[in-house]
């Protein structure tokens, strides 16, 4: 028994962390002409403007963008991280999308573009409001960010 426990403890750093979180929409992220200057990941050493992005529409994968709890605030080292969000509907059908993190959200939450949430929930974002999801961080390149 002790050997089994030690084996799993040894493997735990290699495991991908899957978290239970919630997602809601914020239509601010649907407006392609919105400047990056209104989000936490604008400028600074970890900001997205240093890579030539200027507004939401210039970001790869727009409108699959939003705020993530992992982004602590302005100039976070987690700016530009990519998150796979998986929603399971009432019939047990799951759907996943990848979201580029560009702004701060509360711990355990994501706030994403309405269009992105409609993709995730089969056009039920407004009806559902906030939903439970599982999230896991994936390579930024999955969201089209190759920096």
What kind of feature is each model-predicted range?
Residues 12, 16-115, 119-147:
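Secreted/periplasmic proteins
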Residues 1-11:
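Classical eukaryotic N-terminal signal peptides for Sec-dependent ER targeting/secretion
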């Amino acid at each position: 028994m002790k050997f089994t426990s030690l084996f799993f403890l040894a493997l735990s750093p290699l495991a991908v962390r899957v978290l239970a979180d919630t997602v809601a929409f914020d239509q601010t992220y649907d407006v392609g002409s919105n400047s990056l200057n209104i989000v936490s990941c604008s400028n600074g050493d970890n900001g997205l403007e240093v890579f030539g992005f200027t507004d939401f529409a210039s970001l790869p994968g727009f409108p699959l963008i939003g705020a993530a709890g992992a982004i602590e605030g302005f100039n976070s080292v987690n700016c530009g991280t990519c998150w796979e969000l998986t929603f399971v509907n009432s019939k047990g059908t799951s759907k996943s999308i990848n979201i580029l993190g560009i702004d701060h959200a509360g711990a355990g939450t994501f706030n994403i573009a309405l269009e992105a949430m409609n993709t995730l929930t089969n056009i039920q974002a407004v009806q559902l409001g906030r939903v439970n999801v599982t999230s896991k961080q994936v390579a930024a390149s999955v969201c089209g960010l190759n920096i």
